[in-house]
Amino acid sequence: MATAWESEYFDKVTPGERERAVPPMVPQQTPPPVYIQPQVSRNGIVASIVLRLLTLIFAVVALAVLASNTGSFQVSTGSATSVKTIKFTILSAFTYLFAVCGVVAVYSLLLIIVEMIDLAVRGFTTHTLVAIFVFVLDQTMAYVLISAASASANGVKVSRDESNITGYKFDISCSNLGIDDYCTKASASVAIAFIAFLFMAITAGVSARRLFKLP
């Protein structure tokens, strides 16, 4: 005789029907890190964008000042007198600074776009490989920019001294050529490049902090 607990009134299965097996619960998979909500605060991303924007502005200004820097002087050869014009390309250090400022400006613009997208959709720059890539590039850009600015600072010193900056066989400088404006604008572009480096270095520090805070 069946007990009450074994009767059909206490069973959830209809008499004659086999008990259905309950499927095992499948554990929910953890999404890959790229889709995890970033732990970096929104303020950190905004600060990085602002710093990159400042770097971009100062790099473009330094590039523009350097590109527009020219000087004219007269050269007498016998009875003939000719007017010569020099540009920033007269010294390789200035050409180097011009190229570096252009690269830093383009790089900063690209990273601003990337981080603005990241600010909207979140999660892209928090991927470990991307964060490492950005960190390495920030460090590289800061190093290259400070090396170019330092070399150009020495170029300004050479231009102001009694040194050959025009390619002629005799020593001529900004002072005795009457092109002091040339050296002044060159000094201004170098100073602006140093300011751009300052913001680039701070940006590199921010990217390093974001990298080390990733899980």
Swiss-Prot record:
Give its localization: Cell membrane
Its record classes its membrane topology as:
Multi-pass membrane protein
- Kindly indicate whether the keyword Glycoprotein belongs to this entry: yes
Going by the UniProt record, its keywords in alphabetical order are: Cell membrane, Glycoprotein, Membrane, Transmembrane, Transmembrane helix
Q: Which residues are glycosylated?
A: N164
- Residue spans, topological domain Cytoplasmic: 1-44, 115-128, 207-215
Question: Pfam families per the record?
Answer: CASP_dom
Q: Answer yes or no on keyword Heme.
A: no
Q: Which GO terms describe its cellular component?
A: plasma membrane
Where do the TM regions start and end? 45-65, 94-114, 129-149, 186-206
Record topology, Extracellular segments: 66-93, 150-185
Family statement drawn from the similarity comment of this UniProt entry: Belongs to the Casparian strip membrane proteins (CASP) family.
Question: Can you state the subunit structure given in the record?
Answer: Homodimer and heterodimers.
Q: What is this protein called?
A: CASP-like protein UU3
Provide the species name.
Answer: Physcomitrium patens (Spreading-leaved earth moss)
